Amino acid sequence: TLMALVVAVLFALVVAACGGTSGGGDGEDSGGDGGGGEDAAVDLPECPVDALENVTAADPVEVTVWHSYVAKTQQALEDLAAQYNDSQDRVVVRVESQGNSYSELQRKYQQAIPSGDLPGIAILEDTQNQSMADSGTVIPLDSCDAADDSFDTEDFLPIALDYYAIDDVVWPVSMNLSTPILYYNRKHFEQAGLDPDNPPTTLAEMRDAAQAIADANIPGIEAPWVQVSNPSFVESWMTGAGVELVNNGNGRDEPATAATIDGNEQLLDLFNYLNDMVDDGLLNPLPDTEGQIDQYTAMATQRSSMAIETTTAATSIEAFLKGQLDTSQLSSDGRINVEGLDLAGLDIDAAPLPGVEEPGRPQVGGGVYYITNTTPPEVQAAAWDFVKFINSTESQVFNNLQGSYMPLLESAVDDPELKATWEDTLSGQWLALGFNQLQTGVDPEAPGITLGPYTEFRDELGTALEDMYFNDGDPADVLGQAQANIDEAITRYQEENF
């Protein structure tokens, strides 16, 4: 129950928020074919890694980290900062929450750009990568890699570098990785005559399972599938099927100049599928509002049997079920309340993301670390030193086990504690599921969209979903309107230099 609620809140942070406006720049460095490396860091901002050499314990450098995490994910970040502070005496890292959603954090970051009053590090949502690169306010990973002989990216997951590369330059200095998976109620599957060990693998099978659950007339179920109208899931379904949503190779061959939504047969088929599911009472769509948790309450109270969310909340879910989670962080409106919930009777499991054609084909998601270039050199160097700590195998293992993010390093999966957790605990098995999707399910040649006005793109795609669900919009019409609005946003981004 609570588990589901927690997942919802954390996932809302991961995928629901695209932030405020995009950053500056002319959009000419969008695109890229993955990778990154020192050869690309020729005309990039410098990373003053040596500026920390003259700093002493008597006058340590302070680095502020902005984030928008909650629950176990927030605690993991705070614990890592404390561990780093205890490990040395020249840098003090201070972790500051800027709200409970990526969009709120992004707005604050954008508002601070004119004054330059930015933190040393900002952990922003993955869709901000192009606009952050264009903003002129951050130092790319490749610059720090080239300047620091003690560091390399050989151990990084290749798909992470591929996804975040723009013209072969990787801008985030660290990546908190997550992917969407299917959460489902095993007891409901059994009651409907379904095999709980063989959950749906495709959207067609999702409909079959939902119909079987509906036909079983299980007491209390209002709709077999509850789902937030989150456009990132649409992106995952389309990316997994090899369908582009903006032109020029999803903006990776060269800067995208238009969306490819209107007249996109595969996307229209998906919208028609979802619309039919709602019309037939098999899917309960929810508005994609900040802090949305109703999908979790539906799962917690067993009013629904299935939901698609990310791996990010796995540890929070488990902690919630065990009564070890401080739920006061998650909601101020009283909607998260464990009293009266049948936690013992809630049997939740997870499976790879059901796809259009095959399972486990998601799009990369999560939060990413950026080092700003508006602070003094010694602060930039101190921020890099902390990031190197975050990028260590030990920290990546800790962040996975405590914060539910996928490890960025391939070496992390060989850690004995991580191995045992992934094999022996419920949350660990879900995390292993997500990691496997990252390794095998994302096409490195087509990992997803890169776009300056990605915020506007996702907002318009989400609006199209909600207009169809809640305003009786015709699928073709809402997609046509989304196309027009996205094209305007792309043109405006190019003309106004952000």
Language model regions located:
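Extracytoplasmic "Venus flytrap"/periplasmic binding protein-like
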Residues: Q83-F156, Y163-A165, Q191-G193, T297-M299, ...
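Long, aromatic- and glycine/proline-rich binding clefts that accommodate carbohydrate-like moieties
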Residues: G345-L353, L401-T463, D467, F498
